From Swiss-Prot:
Domain Integrase catalytic: 105-268
This protein's name: Insertion element IS600 uncharacterized 31 kDa protein
Any one Pfam family match given in the protein's UniProt record, by short name: rve
Keywords: Transposable element
Domain of life: Bacteria
GO molecular function, one term: nucleic acid binding
GO biological process: DNA integration
Keyword Lipid metabolism annotated: no
Keyword Protease: no
Amino acid sequence: MCQVFGVSRSGYYNWVQHEPSDRKQSDERLKLEIKVAHIRTRETYGTRRLQTELAENGIIVGRDRLARLRKELRLRCKQKRKFRATTNSNHNLPVAPNLLNQTFAPTAPNQVWVADLTYVATQEGWLYLAGIKDVYTCEIVRYAMGERMTKELTGKALFMALRSQRPPAGLIHHSDRGSQYCAYDYRVIQEQSGLKTSMSRKGNCYDNAPMESFWGTLKNESLSHYRFNNRDEAISVIREYIEIFYNRQRRHSRLGNISPAAFREKYHQMAA
């Protein structure tokens, strides 16, 4: 064989016994760590956030090298999809002015909340989800789920948020013009709690961008990868995603690549 390929016998055996370079071995070890981190973060992190995730677990790697190894491993984030609007603003109920005008710039928790409804398909029928998000911390303050898209569902989410946070008077509560948010009972809760009511312009999803962004994240990173047999299955997955992953683990670039819960804790430590 050596004669056929025109190489010496000693050269051939040196090639057979040659060990991978230190760099190659280091890359292989890093690939294992990257794969583990990719799975741990539910296949949702790009290079920047994955680099932070690795660093906090004692793995230091440059961004270019990480990008190269991710490409070699063919790791990709879960794909984004578009979703339809949920609430119906065709009603004769009173509508509040838009106090935010797409200026989402609070300087502390419990200054601006955004609220919205979405739905999840199951074999048993639709599951509706009402959520409230703190714009400053990106945290889902509270949420409620049910079989019907009613004012009672949105009211339950708001009541739980108020009970858990006890925000100061003057907090801006922003939503779309859906009848569930314009309902008399819902507005009474807001007024009695000292909240300022703000509503999006008709048909303008960008006026409630922070909440729309969360729905997209929830569906892209979690719900679109399931086929639920019933509502209980969907409820379990949603609860786990929000309470375990999104609020406590998922890194947000806007928050300095830390989780909403960590950002809130950091704020209170600095304010103390």
